[in-house]
From Swiss-Prot:
Dermonecrotic toxins cleave the phosphodiester linkage between the phosphate and headgroup of certain phospholipids (sphingolipid and lysolipid substrates), forming an alcohol (often choline) and a cyclic phosphate. This toxin acts on sphingomyelin (SM). It may also act on ceramide phosphoethanolamine (CPE), lysophosphatidylcholine (LPC) and lysophosphatidylethanolamine (LPE), but not on lysophosphatidylserine (LPS), and lysophosphatidylglycerol (LPG). It acts by transphosphatidylation, releasing exclusively cyclic phosphate products as second products. One of its GO terms (biological process) is lipid catabolic process. Its cofactor is Mg(2+). One of its GO terms (cellular component) is extracellular region. It comes from Sicarius cf. damarensis (strain GJB-2008). Its main location: secreted. The active site is at residues 5, 41. This is Dermonecrotic toxin SdSicTox-betaIIB1aii.
Length: 274
């Protein structure tokens, strides 16, 4: 999975897909009451990027629904995963549950259209810290209460704050989540990051019977040398400001026979058995 990073303006979707991404990440900004308003990162952000691009969240969902719906004029077959980077650190932790309700309802109304949409992308909920876990509980409660629990099959969980992996496992256990879990490891492209935690996550992913990590990705990679390093370690995905660079690295002799781009037929919730 090549995840285009910070794809917050509607016009950026095609831009990143044209560069080779098969997944996109966008930022969800909330008001003080936990209501999702816009796709927007804000300052500071990655080096060399404009931090201020944005769109109305519901309008963004309406567009991305079309882009991921077969037979729609806007359909792009390669886009199979949507990562929602939830900016919950900007609101009170007491509002995390309200935020989870709101995002679930907006996805129901504008992406899935309560069963009337054929939009097919998988959804990854990127949660900043484990203390925000009430967002997940609310999201799942809302799908159940609204009568659309089946959409849980399309939704995965990912904690992005580089916290202790055992601490994350404990929270997933509290929530009763034993599947459909990704684990991110990384830092803004402005800084270097070691591989200790990334290696630990990959080791847990590959441990038989360990159900709290199905996929691991590294972020935000812009240098080809770091992309190569991550691929050698065996990551499932790379988040990048430059998907075209990832494509070029994947075509190199060292990686061409070991990796390929994920398609819709690849289940993002299953561990890869090479």
């Amino acid at each position: 999975w090549i995840m285009g990073h910070m794809v917050n303006a509607i016009e950026q979707v095609d831009e990143f897909l044209n560069l080779g991404a098969n997944a996109i990440e966008f930022d969800i900004d909330f008001d003080k009451d936990g209501i999702a308003q816009i796709t927007h990162h804000g300052i500071p952000c990655d080096c060399g990027r404009k931090c201020t691009k944005k769109a109305i969240f519901t309008e963004y969902l309406d567009n991305i629904r079309q882009v991921t719906t077969p037979d729609d004029p806007k359909f792009r077959e390669q886009l199979v995963l949507l990562a929602l980077d939830l900016k919950l650190r900007r609101i009170s932790s007491a509002k995390a549950y309200r935020a989870g309700e709101d995002v679930a309802k907006k996805l129901l109304d504008h992406y899935w259209q309560r069963g009337n949409s054929k939009a097919r992308a998988y959804i990854l909920l990127n949660i900043p810290l484990v203390e925000d876990y009430e967002f997940i509980r609310a999201f799942k409660d809302t799908l159940k209460n609204e009568g659309y629990e089946s959409y849980n099959d399309k939704v995965g969980i990912n904690f992005t704050g580089n916290e202790d992996l055992d601490k994350i496992r404990d929270v997933l256990e509290i929530l009763g989540i034993h599947k459909q879990v990704w684990q991110a490891d990384g830092i803004t492209s402005c800084f270097a990051r070691g591989t200790e935690r990334l290696k630990e996550a990959l080791k847990k992913r590959d441990t038989p019977g360990y159900n709290y990590i199905n996929k691991v990705y590294a972020w935000t990679l812009v240098r080809k040398s770091i992309m190569r390093r991550s691929l050698r370690l065996g990551v499932d995905g790379v988040m990048s400001n430059n998907p075209d660079r990832v494509i070029k690295v994947l075509k190199e002799k060292e990686f061409a026979d070991k990796f390929r781009l994920a398609t819709y037929n690849d289940n993002p919730w299953e561990k890869f058995r090479g």
